[in-house]
Amino acid sequence: MTDVADVNVGIIRFPGTNCDRDIEYAVNLVGANSHYIYWNETDLSQMDVVIIPGGFSYGDYLRAGSIAGITPIIDAIKDFAKKENPVLGICNGAQILGEIDLVPGVFIENENAKFICKSKKLKVNTTRTPFTKLYKKNEVIDLPIAHKEGRYYTDNLETLYDNNQIVLTFEDGNPNGSLDNITGVCNVDGNVVAVMPHPERAVEKLLRSEDGLKFFKSFLD
């Protein structure tokens, strides 16, 4: 078990990020240290984990995550991931990870072209990532979603199954038209995870569900 007091989590902030404080709360709740890292910084050497929050980086102009994907911090995130360090992108963070090719596929506009905000039942398809290893395989969890561009698509679906890269799928109906109900994927190595649902909004029973807490406890295990 890692000494949580020694774990430093970098929370990336872009103009338009708005879920950073929720993630800070979740990280601190499990006892790790949270640090805000801004879009124009280039050093992640003191971090053990990087989390890219949700929000609307740069107003989601052009395409969700596209402008954030060319900022100075991106090369540092790529280098961090290349060393097999844990990287988690949530909602807009997941879109950014798709934009910079750290995970396969893309998250595009919902089939109904509307913003969807609701709680969903999700299946944990793999426990091999740093963020899901405390769950049971095929465990069903309750997490909120809140997005307009959350429909997952890839040309390489068979490869995802072959490599065990599907992290989360919708279990109680597909709200946005995602391919094969997919709402979370990882890279081949499993250290980079992109999920559209918000685990940081489900860390206490007061918030309806605490099913997201293991996302943050897992990287400490």
Curated annotation (Swiss-Prot):
Subunit structure: Part of the FGAM synthase complex composed of 1 PurL, 1 PurQ and 2 PurS subunits.
Record's keyword terms, sorted: ATP-binding, Cytoplasm, Glutamine amidotransferase, Hydrolase, Ligase, Nucleotide-binding, Purine biosynthesis
InterPro entries named in the record: Class_I_gatase-like, PRibForGlyAmidine_synth_PurQ
HAMAP family the UniProt entry points to: PurQ
Lineage: Archaea, Methanobacteriati, Methanobacteriota, Methanomada group, Methanobacteria
Species, as recorded: Methanosphaera stadtmanae (strain ATCC 43021 / DSM 3091 / JCM 11832 / MCB-3)
GO CC aspect terms: cytoplasm
CDD domains from the UniProt entry: GATase1_FGAR_AT
Protein name: Phosphoribosylformylglycinamidine synthase subunit PurQ
Pathway field: Purine metabolism; IMP biosynthesis via de novo pathway; 5-amino-1-(5-phospho-D-ribosyl)imidazole from N(2)-formyl-N(1)-(5-phospho-D-ribosyl)glycinamide: step 1/2
NCBIfam families listed in its UniProt record: FGAM_synth_I (TIGR01737), PRK03619.1 (NF002957)
Domain of life: Archaea
